[in-house]
Amino acid sequence: MQFKFLTTVALATLAVAVPTDPPPTNQCNAPNNLECCNSVQAPTNSGLIGTLLGLLNISVGDITGLVGLTCNPISLIGGGNSCNAQTVCCQNNYFGGLISIGCTPIIIDV
């Protein structure tokens, strides 16, 4: 009798103690963060992206996600905007879309 009780308590404790996956940290605040970028690349210290990040005093190591260049906001309301390049959801937008960081590709089926 005691063995069954202890086994049940031990299994219940184990089930509660098992870690779960954390919620995703990169969530899109659509439609506010949806953008159409002419170029989307991994952050690097070299080339145009490295130069722009350096001018903004942003360390490549601090960036999670991709970097978008020449991005324009996409409005889901009204249907006037369409994206012929890469649709992304970006966390930060600098200089009116010249460079956006923390971008995640989005697939929009119309």
Curated annotation (Swiss-Prot):
One of its GO terms (molecular function) is structural constituent of cell wall. It is found in: Secreted; Secreted, Cell wall. Glycans are attached at residue 57. PROSITE patterns: HYDROPHOBIN (PS00956). Its main location: secreted. The keyword Protein transport does not apply. Disulfide bonds join 28-89, 36-83, 37-71, 90-103. GO terms for cellular component: extracellular region; fungal-type cell wall. SMART domains: HYDRO (SM00075). Residues 1-17 form the signal peptide. Keywords: Cell wall, Disulfide bond, Glycoprotein, Secreted, Signal. It holds the Pfam family Hydrophobin. Self-assembles to form functional amyloid fibrils called rodlets. Self-assembly into fibrillar rodlets occurs spontaneously at hydrophobic:hydrophilic interfaces and the rodlets further associate laterally to form amphipathic monolayers. Belongs to the fungal hydrophobin family. Aerial growth, conidiation, and dispersal of filamentous fungi in the environment rely upon a capability of their secreting small amphipathic proteins called hydrophobins (HPBs) with low sequence identity. Class I can self-assemble into an outermost layer of rodlet bundles on aerial cell surfaces, conferring cellular hydrophobicity that supports fungal growth, development and dispersal; whereas Class II form highly ordered films at water-air interfaces through intermolecular interactions but contribute nothing to the rodlet structure. This is Class I hydrophobin 2. The lineage of its organism: Eukaryota, Fungi, Dikarya, Basidiomycota, Agaricomycotina.
